[in-house]
Amino acid sequence: MRKTMVIPTYWSRRSGEPWQEGDAIYDHPTPVDQEGTLERTLVSMKRFREKDFKLVILVCPTTEDVEEAALAQVRRIVLRSGLGAETYLFSAGDLREIAGILRGAGLDERALRLLSMYGYANVRNVCLLAASILTADAALLIDDDEVFEMDDYVQRAMEFIGRRVYGDVVHGVAGYYLNSKNQYYDDVKPEPWMTYWDRFGSKGEAFDRIIGSGPRLKRTPFAFGGAMTLHRELFECVPFDPLVPRGEDVDY
């Protein structure tokens, strides 16, 4: 089964330069004059026993003003990491070029608006587009601030994909993250406002119910975009909702 791992990485204006109207908003984009966490993620991938996958680094700037600087910074980081996997950089300029080709082929403007790196849902959809372009049978979606500790991560992520389990074919699976205490809860410092909006408590309760109970593979009402594997039959038919700018804040 052909596999493509896609890692979106988010880059903002230089340190000290304020956010400007129209800039995309992400949790923690890295200023283009800093290193960020991407290299740490790539270096941790060296422990994989299996590197039989194509890697796409999706360079997502918060503004067109930093596109070139972000791409240059990511290129330096990838070369320095020395991962040894077949790696592609996918930039906003590449996406515009693809949009131009599709426009010339007759794709209407409404559909072309979906080709955007602005906002989390659009970024995730471009991740799926990259996997489709590389004819992947499975897309492994990862975040740029993760550290891999299991050398068999790829095998685990692919274990059930395309197989029939409990009478149904598995077209998508999602994993979870461990915090600094080796727990699956959010690693957050308690704040007074949490007394009145206990979203982390609600998430913890949901995590206990889904992650903390057997069996290992089960249906779930939520998933983590940065620990997700999707089969081609799913990701070429079902996109992320482009009208939802975020994911984790939708409902508690």
Name these PLM-found stretches.
Residues 70, 74-130, 134:
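Active-site-proximal specificity loops/subdomain of glycosyltransferases
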Residues 136-149:
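Short beta-strand-to-loop acidic/aromatic patch adjacent to the donor-nucleotide binding site
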Residues 233-234:
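Short, well-ordered alpha-helical scaffold segment located
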Residues 1-73:
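N-proximal low-complexity "stem/linker" segments adjacent to membrane-targeting elements
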Residues 149-172:
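Conserved donor-nucleotide/metal-binding helix-loop-beta segment in metal-dependent transferases, i.e.
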Residues 209-229:
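A recurrent flexible, glycine/aromatic-enriched loop bordering the glycosyltransferase active site
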